[in-house]
């Protein structure tokens, strides 16, 4: 099966669907290299054509809000699309609600993407990791590689789009947005969000909001 998934097959599928290279590889691997079935696989996942749409201007959209049970956590989020018609549609509104709940469930998330994280945060994390005792005595090249892996892991923890989707942990938020874009036929972008916590800055007993929000999505 692996031999059938050649670079040419991947390129051809990418040209036909506009899907990302890794998505094309996954589709071909899942369908034993059958291009037609791979296209259907991508369509079912909502991935086909989503990549081609990602470069188009998304100036419409909506600002969504979510207030967690007990009114202790609130979220405002802006998600953009290309047309007001799509912004009013059920699929876009569902995405808006789902990602709002995701933010509420992820108190450690501060940025939309890892690219949004300021360089000073990256440098601070590097300094912390380089100073850890478990790196003592390791060759410099190995130390750099270990530190890089740890930093990347930490940066992903800070980025909304890298989080496992609370309703389906097999998807990241980025993949959820990409699937929605493919299904509605427009570019969709999460632009910004703000998370409010009642009594923030005051020493209070903390609860597991992530577990509470996740439990609300079940049943």
From Swiss-Prot:
Region of interest (Involved in Mg(2+) ion dislocation from EF-Tu), ranges: 83-86
Any one of the GO CC terms: cytoplasm
Pfam family membership, one: EF_TS
Primary location class: cytoplasm
Domain of life the protein comes from: Bacteria
GO molecular function annotations of the record: translation elongation factor activity
Subcellular location: Cytoplasm
SUPFAM superfamilies: Elongation factor Ts (EF-Ts), dimerisation domain, UBA-like
InterPro entries: EF-Ts_dimer_sf, Transl_elong_EFTs/EF1B, Transl_elong_EFTs/EF1B_dimer, Transl_elong_Ts_CS, UBA-like_sf
Keywords: Cytoplasm, Elongation factor, Protein biosynthesis
PROSITE patterns associated with the record: EF_TS_1, EF_TS_2
Job of this protein: Associates with the EF-Tu.GDP complex and induces the exchange of GDP to GTP. It remains bound to the aminoacyl-tRNA.EF-Tu.GTP complex up to the GTP hydrolysis stage on the ribosome.
Similarity section: Belongs to the EF-Ts family.
Protein name in UniProt: Elongation factor Ts
Lineage of the species this protein comes from: Bacteria, Bacillati, Cyanobacteriota, Cyanophyceae, Synechococcales
Gene: tsf
């Amino acid at each position: 099966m692996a031999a059938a998934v050649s670079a040419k097959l991947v390129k051809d599928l990418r040209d036909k669907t506009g899907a990302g290279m890794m998505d094309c590889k996954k589709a071909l691997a899942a369908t034993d290299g059958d291009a037609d079935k791979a296209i259907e696989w991508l369509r079912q996942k909502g991935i086909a054509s989503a990549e081609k749409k990602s470069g188009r201007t998304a100036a419409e959209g909506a600002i969504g809000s979510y207030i967690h049970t007990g009114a202790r956590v609130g979220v405002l989020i802006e998600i953009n699309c290309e047309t007001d018609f799509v912004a009013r549609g059920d699929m876009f509104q569902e995405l808006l609600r789902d990602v709002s709940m995701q933010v509420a469930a992820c108190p450690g998330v501060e940025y939309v993407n890892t690219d949004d994280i300021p360089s000073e945060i990256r440098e601070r994390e590097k300094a912390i990791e380089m100073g850890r005792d478990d790196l003592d005595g390791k060759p410099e090249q190995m130390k750099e590689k270990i530190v890089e892996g740890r930093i990347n892991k930490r940066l992903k923890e800070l980025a909304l789009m890298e989080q496992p989707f609370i309703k389906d942990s097999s998807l990241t938020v980025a993949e959820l947005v990409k699937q929605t874009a493919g299904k509605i036929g427009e570019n969709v972008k999460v632009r910004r969000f703000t998370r409010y916590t009642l009594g923030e800055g005051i020493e209070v007993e903390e609860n597991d909001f992530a577990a509470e929000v996740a439990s609300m999505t079940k049943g």
